[in-house]
Amino acid sequence: MRLVQLSRHSIAFPSPEGALREPNGLLALGGDLSPTRLLMAYQRGIFPWFSPGDPILWWSPDPRAVLWPESLHISRSMKRFHKRSPYRVTMNYAFGQVIEGCASDREEGTWITRGVVEAYHRLHELGHAHSIEVWRKDELVGGMYGVAQGTLFCGESMFSRMENASKTALLVFCDEFIRHGGKLIDCQVLNDHTASLGACEIPRRDYLNYLNQMRLGRLPNNFWVPRCLFSPQE
């Protein structure tokens, strides 16, 4: 296994099975963040993640963290909070604000550089990247964004500026996703936060099999149309 240098003149990726074991999942470096290359990466179970100033690094870890939306863990306190939630939740109302929020709300720094913001904004304009927004009145207080692959959603990042805002985004999205035929959410790498929400690890080969099936599936044509998903009770 060796790290592959990508060419700017080809969008081809090596097989994810050739990714390094240490660091886990590192597959290639270089290339660019053009929409065509990004979409090719997601279709093959590969995603970019790198530090500012470093070359673009491409990953496909084994195992892979996923969340079956029907297995989302909702604590009793979160259930009580959601019943009296002050938040309004929308889809695709403010993609730019959400990704900017994810970039700025990281005390330890972020991989979401200006170039990354612009790249995913292009994907959004092409109808492939989507956002969930959480509002307190007219203030954006949390949200999440990711890339759609048929009935699979590749979650990229979330942020929260008020209590339970990002959890509300995920809860409302999972409910809507399930009701319209969504099957699986890719969480990439398991951490304490995603594990607490019900995410689990599966072998990479299983994830790739699910991806190959689900990316050919279809949600309703109007699923990603900008709309309100949840409003607080009066």
Swiss-Prot record:
Its main location: cytoplasm. It comes from the Bacteria. The keyword Transferase applies. It catalyses: N-terminal L-lysyl-[protein] + L-leucyl-tRNA(Leu) = N-terminal L-leucyl-L-lysyl-[protein] + tRNA(Leu) + H(+); N-terminal L-arginyl-[protein] + L-leucyl-tRNA(Leu) = N-terminal L-leucyl-L-arginyl-[protein] + tRNA(Leu) + H(+); L-phenylalanyl-tRNA(Phe) + an N-terminal L-alpha-aminoacyl-[protein] = an N-terminal L-phenylalanyl-L-alpha-aminoacyl-[protein] + tRNA(Phe). Its EC number is 2.3.2.6. One of its GO terms (biological process) is protein catabolic process. It is found in: Cytoplasm. One of its GO terms (molecular function) is leucyl-tRNA--protein transferase activity. Keywords: Acyltransferase, Cytoplasm, Transferase. InterPro entries: Acyl_CoA_acyltransferase, Leu/Phe-tRNA_Trfase, Leu/Phe-tRNA_Trfase_C, Leu/Phe-tRNA_Trfase_N. One of its GO terms (cellular component) is cytoplasm. It comes from Escherichia fergusonii (strain ATCC 35469 / DSM 13698 / CCUG 18766 / IAM 14443 / JCM 21226 / LMG 7866 / NBRC 102419 / NCTC 12128 / CDC 0568-73). This is Leucyl/phenylalanyl-tRNA--protein transferase. The lineage of its organism: Bacteria, Pseudomonadati, Pseudomonadota, Gammaproteobacteria, Enterobacterales. Functions in the N-end rule pathway of protein degradation where it conjugates Leu, Phe and, less efficiently, Met from aminoacyl-tRNAs to the N-termini of proteins containing an N-terminal arginine or lysine. It holds the Pfam family Leu_Phe_trans. Belongs to the L/F-transferase family.
